Amino acid sequence: MLFRSRKLDFSNLSEAPVGTAKKIEDLEVNANNRRSIGLVAPGGNLRLYNLAGKAVPANGTSFAAPLVTGTVALLQEFGDRQLRTKSTLPANIKPRWTLDARRHEVMKAVLLNSADKVQDNGDGLRLGMTRTMLAKNNRDWLESEAYSDRQIPLDYQLGAGQVNADRAYRQFSSGQYSGATPVPMIGWNYHALDVGAYQDYLIDRPLAEGSFVSLTLTWDRLVELTDIDGNQEYSLGEEFRDRGLNHLDLYLMHAEDDRISQSVWSSISKVDSVQHIFHQIRDPGKYKIRVHFRQAVNLPRQGYALAWWSRSNNQ
């Protein structure tokens, strides 16, 4: 089997500010140790034509961004087609598509959850990922803080991994599942919780020993416009007010357990608007996902998007 890897370009690395350049670098990264990189995409050593018609090398995020936005456009086109098909189906058939498919939180959860981290060996245990991403010092995602620390959802340099349009399509096309009944191995949902409440998603088949499970939870920080002139849009001189971030947590649990202290793994960052779990299953069996609205900083009800990808012995 051909091993495929890609190391991030040095010029585009993100890292915690340290040393003599810390004062300058502090201005370039998120505050409070929040992860500024969510996703990476190919943008180095590209051959592009300049205005003179000559092929020249190009590097940078400006060339990586179109791959991400293009993937979103493809997913939205597919989602709209599913919504149009839904309107022609008999009333007794309930397709897994609603207008939630257009929400930006859903797109973010789908892209992050389907990103490539470590190449699959061909047995599907690594969820069919197509390449291994390498950060500085040639370390992969399994060697990152994000893999081993429950309070760190994303890697500083790799984020959740490299965007993969085909895997994003597979993640998104699986459809929406509310959690009211057992959910399939791959899926997504948009929902809202009141403070203190939680929502469980019971996976309908036992997870395979040695397989990985990928879970991503996304929601928004509440930022409001100080609308001085009352025209409900930004005007020169007006400012935006940060009302803070509600605190949601994400847990992977055995199906029969109910206390979060019994969770197999969790993502419980206090500063990020994303929680992410990429965890290897040591004990095969039935599992469930739990989303918990732990603390309200602004509004007492919070919308969120969840995406999951897992593997059973029968896949």
What is each PLM-predicted segment?
Residues 29, 57-65, 69, 96-101, ...:
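Hydrophobic alpha-helical scaffolding
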